[in-house]
Amino acid sequence: CDRRQRQMCIRDSGDTVDLSGRVIGKHDGLMYYTLGQRRGLGIGGMNEGTGESWFVVGKDLKRNRLVVQQGEHEELFSTALTAEKLSFISGCAPAKQFRCTAKFRYRQPDRGVTVTMHGDGATIDFDSPERAVTPGQWVVLYDGDVCLGGGPIDEVAPLKALPKIFTD
């Protein structure tokens, strides 16, 4: 798919596959699933599985495949993110590089991060790997109880990349 076609095909149903590429079900359209999602995958109760829950670990946009794996695998974790359009309540970042805390999900405890600004965006390195940080969601930055600002997540740096069969 080219970019425009990719936008359309993410709405189309397709195969749900495990990390080996084995088809284990069908999905309703990639746009309806997020990294780390466990519910609503339509693959529970598989006899061949380990009995652990299935989680979304990636999306193969080129082939319209939803990639899932059982259990808490490294593919669910990332070490950093990029946010290209951060906004700060004060009007500007506190410094070119600074330490603060961040939240990536509603009601999540604060997580220690180092923010390195580049233009209106930043690379945000996590103190420890974080589970299911997802492009399209927001990162919100804090100094104690004070909200510094935030913005949409554009990319994440995975702790362990998906196998090459999903990225070439």
Sequence positions of predicted segments:
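Hydrophobic alpha-helical segments, especially N-terminal targeting/anchoring helices
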Residues: 2, 17-18, 142
